[in-house]
């Protein structure tokens, strides 16, 4: 536990009470969800969404644990969905000059990295022209 940020460690410790049966059930449920979502998303080339759903807060705004955990969960929401699916994703910077940094996330199904990179290059070119 030494070396972990206390806020990260508290999340890791949440799983300490789970047993083998709990883990197996969660793995089966995740695999079922992955199969269903993959089947639904086959007809799309990519999913487009904000990399994070809000402008990043200042460090001072996250001093209290409750504010940190609320913001952290929100910031990880979109990428976490792709991670849970075992998908692939990337983020393209797309802010206007002088504006706060924002990113456009392109996400794809598992093992579709090459196709997703092709879409990213095309979108990046269009953004550069805008």
Q: Model segments located where?
A:
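Short alpha-helical functional segments enriched in proximate histidine and acidic residues
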Residues: 36, 40
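Structural helix-boundary/capping segments
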Residues: 24, 35, 84-130
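An anion/phosphate-binding loop that grips the pyrophosphate of nucleotide cofactors and donors
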Residues: 44
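Short helix-loop capping/hinge segments that flank enzyme active sites or metal/cofactor-binding pockets
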Residues: 1-34, 91-101
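Short, surface-exposed loop/helix-turn segments at secondary-structure junctions
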Residues: 25, 56-76
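Small-aliphatic-rich amphipathic alpha-helix that forms the alpha element of a beta-alpha
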Residues: 69-92
